[in-house]
Structure formats: C-alpha cells, structure tokens
Amino acid sequence: MAEPELVNGGVKENKLWKGVFAVSGIMSTLVIYGVLQEKIMRVPYGVNKEFFKHSLFLVFCNRLTTSAVSAGALLASKKVLDPVAPVYKYCLISVTNILTTTCQYEALKYVSFPVQTLAKCAKMIPVMVWGTLIMQKKYKGFDYLVAFLVTLGCSVFILFPAGDDVSPYNKGRENTVWGVSLMAGYLGFDGFTSTFQDKLFKGYNMEIHNQIFYTTLCSCVLSFTGLILQGHLLPAVDFVSLHRDCLLDIALLSTVATASQFFISYTIRTFGALTFAAIMTTRQLASIMLSCIWFSHPLSWEQCIGSVIVFGSLYAKNLLNNKKNSQTQPPPPELPQYEKVESS
C-alpha cells in the first residue's frame, strides 16, 4: 500500500511544480509586458523628449518574433508546417488581432495603463455577444450578473479619476473620450478574435503552434503592408535607430509577448481555462499596482471601490466555477493514463 501512496505523492508534487512554473511564467512575462508597453507609448525618449507614435510597428515586431519562434517549435517537434484550416480563416483572426493590438497601443496615448487594464476586464460582454452570434452559446443569469458588475466597476474606475494625478507622463495627453472609444474597439475586436479562435480549435484538429504560426505570419504580412501604405515604416526605423533605448524596449517587449503566448498555451493545456482565468485576474491586479507605483498614477477612493467590484466579481466567478467543476469532474485517472495525457 505504501507504493501507490508514494506514486500519488510524486504526481501531486509534479503538478505543484508545474503550477509554480505556469504562474511565475505568466505573471513575470505579462507584468513586464504591461510596464514596457506603457513606457514605449507614454514616456518620451531622448533629450528632445520625443514620443514613439508608430503602434503598428510594435505589432509587426511582436508578430514577427512570435511567428519565428512558433515555426522553430513546429520544426523542432518534427511537425508539418502545412495549414490545417483554410488560410482565409487564419487571416480573419490576424486582421481582428491586429486591430485589437493597435487599439490597445493607441489607447495608451490617451488613458493610463491602470484604466486600460481594468477596462480589459469588461471583455466578458463582447465575448458573450460574439459567443451567442458565432457559436450559439447560451449563458446563465449569473454570467450576466458578473458581466454587469464588472462593467459597473470599470465605469466607476474610468469616470472618477484621481484629481491630483502627479504623473509627469499624463500632462497634455489625457483624452478620456477618445481613449475609451479605442478601448471599446479593443474589446469588440478581442472578443471576436478569442471566440473565432475557439471555433477554429473545435472545428479543426490543430496544434496550438500551428494556429499561432499561421495567425502571426498573416499578421506580419498585414502589419508590414500597413506600415508601407501609411508611410510609417521608415520613420519608425529612423526613430529606433536614433533612440537605441527604444529599440531595446521593443525587442524586450516582443520577447516577453512571445514567451507569454507559450506560457498561456501551456497553462490552459495543463490546468484548464478556469485556473488560467484566476491567474490572469491576479496578473491584472498586480499590473495595475505596479503601474501605479512605477509611473506615479494615484488612485481615487472611487477607483479603489471600482477595483474591488471588478476583481471581487471575477474571483467570485472563478471560485464558483472551480467548485462546480470539482463536483462534476470524475475521479482522477490512474498514473499510466495521467502520463499519457501529459505527453500528448
């Protein structure tokens, strides 16, 4: 009897270390990503205090890095690079993903990172709308209640900013109406992207690296074309060649963005979407706190209440979902089956 207990203990310890790896990977990469994107878009470079204005160039660099790494992962695992789904479906995800990321970067010119991060929590509503339209999903009353509370908390956070914002990076740049409009575009496009990705995974038997590779490859082509058509490619290259610290920031941003993609995929595959949602909620809270400290963003008491409403609702939803999931799940499989799942 001692041997099975020893085996089960080893499995639990292995799962624990995988959890530590997943949490530390997601938290570190995405928190660094958040700080870097705010620095690039809101902090001036050089003695002349010039701002980096070419958000599409950031999208291109991020997607180029991710597509190269995902191609390397496919080749290293000796898997074919042939597309599993029709190419136009990858392109559709790419277009909405580019629009999502561009709105995200552009919004940082007009609203602070804490406002943007908390507003991202309101993506539940567009996801529910797109899920109903595209996948004919049905949601319960509790889901709508959580979505309403999160939206309410986000609205309070945006509408009641601190009156004595001492951040030197906000002066003359705040425009709540335009910033909120860009965030609304971000939420709409992001909701469609995630819902259509879900539909693509369920409709085709594809590896995560396959979807990442073709989606980011299409994004590279589209963003590069957009830079040329807008005439922003050479100005962006001139800016980063003149300001080497900006080039370093963009390189690091692309690196952590790529790393976060694979940590996210690993976490969802190993622990499921519910655990991933709880980790992401914690990451958003940590990002807001770090941004407030790093870039001197004060929070009003109304914003603190809004934050409590948002994160309290999200944690309550995750807790209830985990409880419901544990009650409906069958007993854990024996060790040979567990090893088979982990190696797939």
UniProtKB/Swiss-Prot annotation:
Entry's Gene Ontology cellular component terms: membrane
InterPro entries: SCL35B1-4/HUT1
Keyword Membrane: yes
Membrane-traversing stretches: 16-36, 56-76, 115-135, 142-162, 176-196, 220-240, 246-266, 292-312
UniProt-recorded Gene Ontology molecular function terms: antiporter activity
Alphabetic keyword roster: Antiport, Membrane, Sugar transport, Transmembrane, Transmembrane helix, Transport
Keyword match Transmembrane helix: yes
Membrane topology: Multi-pass membrane protein
Residue ranges, annotated region (Disordered): 324-344
Localization per record: Membrane
Disulfide bridge positions per record: none
Family: Belongs to the nucleotide-sugar transporter family. UDP-galactose:UMP antiporter (TC 2.A.7.11) subfamily.
Function statement: Sugar transporter involved in the transport of nucleotide-sugars from cytoplasm into the Golgi and/or the endoplasmic reticulum.
Protein name as catalogued: UDP-galactose/UDP-glucose transporter 5B
Taxonomic source organism: Arabidopsis thaliana
